[in-house]
Every structure is written in structure tokens, then in C-alpha cells.
Amino acid sequence: MKIDVSRLSAAVNDAHARHAQAPGGANASYIPYLAKVPSHLAGVAAVTVDGDQVVAGDADYAFAIESISKVCSLVQALEDHGPDAVREKIGADPTGLPFNSVMALALHDGKPLSPLVNAGAIATVSFLKAANAEERWKKILAMQSALAGADIALSDEVNQSEQTTNFHNRAIAWLLYSASTMYSDPMEACEVYTRQCSTLFTARHLATMAATLAAKGRNPLTGKQVLKPEHVPSVLAEMMMEGLYERSGDWAYMVGLPGKSGVGGGIMAVVPGVMGLAAFSPPLDPAGNSVRGQLMVADVARTLGLNLFDRA
């Protein structure tokens, strides 16, 4: 399936025009940095597997990646250990509960189930092949940059805001440790996980990351093979099951694309073999997904007939 660039451009611009001022939602308030991001911002981007780029609105505004970073640490874990080990040690099942749920751990004897919820992501960071925190962090940051096709940087302001409010995640890390599902020092893993959520991305960067996954692990802008092609299906399966937390089922039902959201207002979706889509707008629904971002990405997907469950 190949999409004409002029048709893609029309779909992206129309989606932005229709939904950039959609009502509803509110900025994440529990992280001080996120609470003060201008809520009117809205951008959408598409990057094809051939490297074509189409953007509209605030697609180049830099925002905190937050939970979308979980995809990057999952990719690194797959590269370090392979899909079987990741499935055994972390899991490959949706929790059906909020992304920071402690109950999910209690219900499953301390196993985090999915690398795309907080418990699983912290465990994933601990599972990476690394001798210490800095080595762990450098691998994750390098992976973020390779997937985005850009020099991704840590925001000290976001990191400070997160590190001083991550009490819940610290508790999760100790619960994992008590259940023997933590594979490094728990506070080291939690600190590095918090850092990985504090880097700055744009919607264009997210669309490039999604396009890299759409292109079987090859970044269409840099030409670099970022991850092994055989690891991509594992990433997309996790995104389809848990990428939008307890709204993942609704997203699959309505949009039919593997996606991942973050409380910074970003969202991305992968159209295998075709393109990556992404959007950014800070106001969130109760599950922590961008209200306008979902609308914009869903609009483009619907206009172009991209639903994976509705393709001949």
C-alpha cells in the first residue's frame, strides 16, 4: 500500500484544521512541568517509509516524551535479550488497568505483564544489559535518538520536575524487587526510567520513530537499521494491546493501528509498510491520552483507509 504524498498532505492538514481546537481534557497536573505547557498547542505529522514528511500546526514544538519512551526501552531490551526473554521476564499481556497501577502487580504475583505500563517499563530498564546507571541511560538515549533520527536531549527542567514527584514509581520499583522481578538496583532503575521520560521530542520525531517501526526497523530519514526486523512484530503487538492503557481496546476497535501515548500530550501510530503518524496536544482524557491527538491521528487513518483490520 502506497499513499500519494498530496493525498497524505491533504489528510494531515484537514485533520489538524478539524480537531486543533477540539474541546475536552486537561493537562497532566501531577507533574509541575506538564501542568504549565500551553494547552492550545496542537500539531500532527506523518513520515512515510520512503522518507516523505508532512506536518501541520505545532508539529515541531518540543515536549516531554513521557510514556512513549517505553517503546524505546522495549526496543533496547529486545535487541539485548530477544523476544522470548522479554516475554518471560517482563510479560506480553495488557493489564486493563491504569498505567501506574499497583493492583496489577498484586493480582499477578509481582509480574509486571507489559513493558508499556510503568511497572513493566521500570523492570525493562532494569533488564537491559548494562553495568551501571550511566551505561543504562546512554543506551536508552542513543536508542531514542536512533529511532527519532535526531539528537534527542534530556530536559533538566522536566527531569527535576519528575524526579521530585515520582514517589509512586519508587514504590512500584520496590514492589518489583520484593517479587524478584527487578533485575538491577530498584532505585537505579527508577531513576533512569524517570530520565528516559524526561527527554524532549516533537510530533515529527514521533512520526519518524513510528515510520522506523513501519519500515521493519529501518529509519527512513537516516537509512540506519535501528532494530532487527524480526523484533518489530513484538513491539507492534505490545503497542496494540497496551499502548493507550485502558483505552487500548477502544483505540484498536476504532482506529485499528498499533499506537502509543504519553501524558506529555504526544501520541504515535504505526501503519506497517506504509508510514508513521503522530500528533501532539497537551489536554488528556482520564486514561492519560491526548484528546486532540487521538482525534487527529484517527482522522488521518480513517481518511486514508489505514485500519489494519479493514484492509483487503
From Swiss-Prot:
| Source organism superkingdom | Bacteria
Q: Which Pfam families match?
A: Glutaminase
Which GO BP terms sit in this record?
glutamate biosynthetic process; glutamine catabolic process
Q: Does the keyword Cell wall biogenesis/degradation apply?
A: no
Q: Which Gene3D superfamilies match?
A: DD-peptidase/beta-lactamase superfamily
E.C. no: 3.5.1.2
Q: Name one GO molecular function term.
A: glutaminase activity
State the UniProt keywords alphabetically: Hydrolase
SUPFAM superfamilies per UniProt: beta-lactamase/transpeptidase-like
Residues at which substrate binds: S67, N118, E162, N169, Y193, Y245, V263
- TM segment ranges: none
Q: Which reaction does it catalyse?
A: L-glutamine + H2O = L-glutamate + NH4(+)
Which PANTHER family does the record cross-reference, listed alphabetically? GLUTAMINASE (PTHR12544), GLUTAMINASE 1 (PTHR12544:SF48)
Family under the similarity heading: Belongs to the glutaminase family.
On subunit structure and binding partners, the annotation says: Homotetramer.
Q: What is the recorded name of this protein?
A: Glutaminase
- Organism of origin is Bordetella avium (strain 197N)
List the taxonomic lineage: Bacteria, Pseudomonadati, Pseudomonadota, Betaproteobacteria, Burkholderiales
